[in-house]
From Swiss-Prot:
Organism expressing this protein natively: Streptococcus pneumoniae serotype 4 (strain ATCC BAA-334 / TIGR4)
Domain MsrB: 172-295
Keyword Transport found: no
Peptide methionine sulfoxide reductase A, as annotated region: 1-155
Enzyme Commission (EC) number: 1.8.4.11, 1.8.4.12
GO cellular component: cytoplasm
GO molecular function (one): peptide-methionine (R)-S-oxide reductase activity
UniProt function note: Has an important function as a repair enzyme for proteins that have been inactivated by oxidation. Catalyzes the reversible oxidation-reduction of methionine sulfoxide in proteins to methionine.
Gene: msrAB2
Record-linked InterPro entries: Met_Sox_Rdtase_MsrA_dom (IPR002569), Met_Sox_Rdtase_MsrA_sf (IPR036509), Met_Sox_Rdtase_MsrB (IPR028427), Met_Sox_Rdtase_MsrB_dom (IPR002579), Mss4-like_sf (IPR011057)
Pfam families in alphabetical order: PMSR, SelR
Full protein name: Peptide methionine sulfoxide reductase MsrA/MsrB 2
Length: 311
């Protein structure tokens, strides 16, 4: 088993989140990297310890990079001594490691995350100096108190983390060579294909749909439904991390445009008339923006890590 120590604000939510991540074998709340080897909850603002979760994981099931991508999903990495409504040095963010070999991956992830922000990261990156296991009543707090305070959305643990660095965007020159003129017009020039005459509007085989420009996974067949609009429709992306949103006021309408995270491809729009039992959203997506990978080809094409997220 491997381990990493993660400070991300109030440890109740961080512990609960990581306890739900496949491949994590244990998550224990405690206090790390303060002054001295002893402390308790009432004293951590004096002893300088940070509320921290000791995450133990099976490296055969989940990598350190994936653990860190989960971590950065749930924190504000530019906020110093504050996460959610919690303020104080005990709520600072930090990644504390016990194996120097992990530092290469940690540095890589920090560098990738830093590029997304104008402000410097406020996340500590240090050897673990000390760790004090928190009092019993803090352990599994949200399991024992399901309506207890939590500053993060622990339900996001159900979604896969998708490593953006695996799917770099080709140059415009390369895209013009690899995409058809119609695919280029839709993804790069914000055009829209015709309804009911596109390749995926009535396709419901098991598999995933990836960005036609980069190959980044975007949608799963398990979230696809027949909406009657004539375009592929989904209740949600395969992960909330892989799409971005932009207000679109073209054609004298106000709509919410959906774009891919890495490729910045125009995908379509999201509307609020989807199935109510699935959240009420309808992602109306151009077939020309995506490529379908059948379930039986996912392993061959490098998407085996998403097989559990396909029906």
């Amino acid at each position: 088993m491997h381990e990493i120590y993660l400070a991300g604000g109030c440890f109740w939510g961080v512990e609960e989140y990581f306890s739900r991540v496949p491949g994590v074998t244990d998550a224990v709340s405690g206090y790390a990297n303060g002054r001295g080897e002893t402390t308790k909850y009432e004293l951590i603002n004096q002893t300088g310890h940070a509320e921290t979760v000791h995450v133990t994981y099976d490296a055969k099931q989940i990598s350190l990079k994936e653990i860190l991508l989960h971590y950065f999903r749930i924190i504000n990495p530019t906020s110093k001594n504050k996460q959610g409504n919690d303020v104080g040095t005990q709520y600072r963010t930090g990644v504390y490691y016990t194996d120097d070999k992990d530092l290469e991956v940690i540095n890589q992830v920090f560098d990738e995350v830093a590029k997304k922000y104008d402000q410097p990261l406020a996340v500590e990156k240090e050897n673990l100096k000390n760790f004090v296991v928190a009092e019993d009543y803090h352990q599994d707090y949200l399991k024992k108190n399901p309506n207890g305070y939590c500053h993060i959305n622990v339900n996001q643990a159900a979604y896969p983390v998708i490593d953006a660095s695996k799917y770099p965007k080709p140059s415009d020159e390369e895209l013009k060579k690899t995409l058809s003129p119609e695919e280029y017009a839709v993804t790069q020039e914000n055009q829209t294909e015709r309804a009911f005459s596109n390749r995926y509007w009535d396709k419901f085989e098991s598999g995933i749909y990836v960005d036609i420009a980069t190959g980044e996974p975007l949608f799963s067949s398990k979230d696809k439904f027949e909406s009657g609009c004539g375009w592929p429709s989904f209740t949600q992306p395969i992960s909330p991390d892989v799409v971005t949103y932009k207000e679109d006021k073209s054609y004298n309408m106000t709509r919410m445009e959906v774009r891919s995270r890495v490729g910045d491809s125009h995908l379509g729009h999201v509307f609020t008339d989807g199935p109510q039992d699935k959240g009420g959203l309808r992602y109306c997506i151009n077939s020309l923006s995506i490529r379908f990978i059948p379930k039986d080809q996912m392993e061959e094409k490098g998407y085996a890590y998403l097989l559990d997220y396909v029906d």
